[in-house]
């Protein structure tokens, strides 16, 4: 609460209220981010600069730890061949977003052409979760294709292993969608 955070600050403890929970805080950050700039810089310009900074860190700071190993694995096991169409499925988490960026980087430097498609399956997210995924994809320059399902509704009343069933159904939908492409 605001009151609790104020009491902690009075005692010299840095604190703030997370009114609306983590999602509320995250939306505040997204709004602040869209207002950043020197007055002349637009939201798109600010996002573009942030995207470039992130991509530069992948290329420079994390090149050896991430990209070199990723590219070596792709090449050693011949996972991508000329003319392939690859669907990168994005959950919205850091792992799938990073995987998408690594594939974009691979395509940028690869010796042969291949296609990339970035899929996001909405199994019944609330508006806030979906907005965060879309915002982060836009920020990172990942052109996502979103398709909706009602998986969350389908497993809502399942008592035994709903997480297992949900995961299987999500994979099934993703495989089907990837085959359509």
Put a short name on every predicted segment.
Residues 1-48:
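Rhodanese-like catalytic fold shared by cysteine-dependent sulfurtransferases
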Residues 42-181:
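ATP-dependent adenylation/nucleotidyltransferase module used to activate substrates
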């Amino acid at each position: 609460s605001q009151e609790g955070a104020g009491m902690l600050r009075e005692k010299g403890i840095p604190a703030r209220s997370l009114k609306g929970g983590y999602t509320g805080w995250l939306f505040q950050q997204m709004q602040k981010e869209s207002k950043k700039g020197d007055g002349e810089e637009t939201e798109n310009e600010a996002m573009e600069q942030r995207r470039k900074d992130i991509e530069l860190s992948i290329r420079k700071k994390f090149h050896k730890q991430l990209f070199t190993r990723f590219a070596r694995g792709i090449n050693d096991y011949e996972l991508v061949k000329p003319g392939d169409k690859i669907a990168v499925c994005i959950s919205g988490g850091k792992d799938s977003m990073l995987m998408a960026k690594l594939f974009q980087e691979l395509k940028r430097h690869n010796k042969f052409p291949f296609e990339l498609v970035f899929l996001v399956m909405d199994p019944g997210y609330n508006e806030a979760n979906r907005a965060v995924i879309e915002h982060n994809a836009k920020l990172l320059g990942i052109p996502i294709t979103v398709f909706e399902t009602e998986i969350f509704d389908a497993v809502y009343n399942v008592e035994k292993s709903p997480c297992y069933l949900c995961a299987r159904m999500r994979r099934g939908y993703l495989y089907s969608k990837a085959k359509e492409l």
